[in-house]
């Protein structure tokens, strides 16, 4: 179906997203923060990255910027999934190159729909 890299420092949320996407047929890998994402992204070559914003070492904002700057990763679709729900946060998400923005707590069905759409998978 497609390959997804799930990036979140909260293990429970990371596993929740990963399990839901795996059950939908996606090949899923995980990373614990933005730096881990950048370290793994070339080897994994995902179609979509779900990316938390508030993480240690390298936050989601800067991770998205770095992904967009690099020619080998600029094409990867990015879904920011964060507790930051203010309008200026959503604007910042657009400015750093996110393709979609979901706020926590999120509906797993909506998250799956967004990832499927960005990965070019047919609707369920």
Where is each model-derived feature located?
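C-terminal output helix
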Residues: 106-116
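Active-site beta3 strand of CheY-like receiver
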Residues: 44-50
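Short hydrophobic/Thr-rich beta-strand motif most characteristic of the beta2 strand and flanking loop
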Residues: 25-32, 40
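Receiver (REC) domain active-site loop signature in two-component systems and cognate sites
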Residues: 55, 78
